[in-house]
UniProtKB/Swiss-Prot annotation:
Species of origin: Lactobacillus delbrueckii subsp. bulgaricus (strain ATCC 11842 / DSM 20081 / BCRC 10696 / JCM 1002 / NBRC 13953 / NCIMB 11778 / NCTC 12712 / WDCM 00102 / Lb 14)
Stretches with biased composition (Acidic residues): 239-253
Keyword Ribosomal protein attributed: yes
Keyword Signal among record annotations: no
Region (Disordered): 226-253
Pfam families: Ribosomal_S2 (PF00318)
Family label: Belongs to the universal ribosomal protein uS2 family.
Molecular function as annotated in GO: structural constituent of ribosome
UniProt-listed InterPro entries: Ribosomal_uS2, Ribosomal_uS2_bac/mit/plastid, Ribosomal_uS2_CS, Ribosomal_uS2_flav_dom_sf
GO CC terms: cytosolic small ribosomal subunit
Lineage: Bacteria, Bacillati, Bacillota, Bacilli, Lactobacillales
GO BP, sorted A to Z: translation
NCBIfam families for the chain: rpsB_bact
Protein name (record): Small ribosomal subunit protein uS2
Keyword terms, alphabetized: Ribonucleoprotein, Ribosomal protein
Amino acid sequence: MSVVSMKQLLEAGVHFGHQTRRWDPKMKPYIFTQRNDIYIIDLQKTIKMLDDAYNYVKAVAQDDGVFLFVGTKKQAQEAIAEEATRAGQYYVNQRWLGGTLTNWTTIQSRVKRLKDLKKMAEDGTFDVLPKKEVSLLTKEMDKLQKFLGGIEDMPRIPDVMFVVDPKKEKIAVHEANKLGIPVVAMVDTNTDPTPIDVIIPSNDDAIRAIRLIAGTMADAVIEGKQGADNADVEKELSESVEENSAEEVDDAE
């Protein structure tokens, strides 16, 4: 059984592509037809490729993978933050800062600055500083929070990046490609799918479509992490049983 039904995809408007004059010919294999000068995405292919994406993400999650959800367009911002957080993962939903991945060391120094400012705000340091200085520091903290808050606790560069609209997020995709980080993405009919490792043919403009696909990816992460946790528990139980059995043998001797 598929992770998402045809009915869910239709209700979310996943099948609506862009106008026929705004298309990328490389998306032709994923187009079913055109209606009123709008391309209609082949949802049979979307279902299959979404299942593939789900299984891939779940497998990486089982191996303790780190995931970065990226979607900075207005329609994606809320869903990206909520679904990444629900899965215990990380996100960029405002402007992508060039070098977020390829210049990770510098980004880490900015993240450290954000953490330091938060600590100053919490431990009372701001209370003893001049108001003007506090105002400047607060503005700096808010700006850093806006752009880096979603990756503040990311332990390392991600193992997989999930992207809404790789055409808009081309800098992020390019950085991931450069570092060999696999990209899973919602790819609309106006986008070149070539740089994407795991393609999900989909409307990438409708809020409901974005939430459905991003939510499905978050579910895959959660299921994978739970599977890993269960495997760890089973391993511990197995080792405990083996130890007890060995002790019983020793006692018998």
